[in-house]
């Protein structure tokens, strides 16, 4: 019986987290109360306090349990990084954009991060959250280094500069789409969007065209 009670408590805790995601995305973190979350979950406010001491604790737990986007996506083509690093990176970027476009929960999380949150000192910082769920500098930097080793990118390529530009480009793309999802179809246009970004910043020879590159000065 105790085991069942523990399982039920865990289900309630997860229900509160899912309800918080919905409410934060809808109302904004600042404007959402624990009563709003309790009502959305169909429980009492007291039940919320049994699991979380505050809205901030609930907010932090919501992000701490969220797996990185790279662990959630499934590229349409499985390409080995060592063999075709740039194409493998392309497929990962496309799969990431399509996952955000097609998955309501992930879209809600992106809305919270980019549009619905004013961070305070006791909350996980925006930087920490991005490091947890988003752009992985280490992974992508390793793939770009592999491109250099395979002579896909020139030896003088400035990897750090490419990482900065890629991160800025994809963050801006997602932010703009969230502001007006009807303006363009992120899911359908993901391949073209990725190809254009990569062609500008990392000499993407994906279509046989001339290479552009950012190099060390």
Explain the meaning of each model-derived region.
Residues 9, 17, 59, 63, ...:
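Amphipathic, non-transmembrane alpha-helical scaffold segments
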Residues 24, 33-34, 45, 55, ...:
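Amphipathic alpha-helical segments enriched in hydrophobic/aromatic and basic residues
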Residues 61, 75-106, 159-166, 206-217:
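Hydrophobic alpha-helical connector segments
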Residues 98-141, 152:
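Short secondary-structure transition hinges
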Residues 71, 75-76, 83, 87, ...:
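Amphipathic alpha-helical packing segments from all-alpha helical-bundle domains
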Residues 1-27, 31-43, 56-57:
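Basic, helix-initiating cap at the start of DNA-binding domains
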Residues 107-111, 125-130, 148-197, 204-217:
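Hydrophobic/aromatic-rich alpha-helical bundle segments in the mid-to-C-terminal region
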């Amino acid at each position: 019986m105790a085991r069942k009670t523990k399982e039920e408590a865990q289900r309630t805790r997860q229900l509160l987290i899912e309800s918080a995601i919905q409410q934060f995305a809808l109302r904004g973190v600042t404007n959402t109360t624990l009563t709003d979350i309790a009502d959305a979950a169909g429980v009492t406010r007291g039940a919320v306090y049994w699991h979380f001491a505050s809205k901030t604790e609930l907010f932090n737990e919501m992000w701490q349990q969220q797996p990185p986007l790279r662990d959630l996506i499934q590229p349409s083509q499985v390409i080995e990084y060592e063999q075709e690093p740039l194409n493998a990176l392309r497929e990962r970027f496309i799969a990431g954009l399509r996952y955000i476009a097609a998955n309501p929960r992930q879209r809600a999380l992106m809305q919270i991060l980019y549009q619905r949150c004013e961070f305070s000192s006791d909350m996980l910082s925006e930087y920490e959250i991005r490091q947890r769920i988003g752009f992985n500098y280490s992974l992508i930097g390793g793939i770009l280094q592999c491109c250099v080793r395979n002579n896909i990118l020139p030896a003088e390529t400035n990897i750090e500069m490419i990482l900065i530009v890629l991160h800025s480009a994809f963050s801006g793309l997602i932010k703009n789409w969230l502001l007006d999802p009807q303006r363009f179809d992120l899911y359908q246009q993901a391949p073209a969007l990725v190809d254009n970004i990569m062609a500008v910043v990392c000499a993407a020879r994906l279509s046989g065209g001339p290479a552009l590159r950012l190099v060390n000065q």
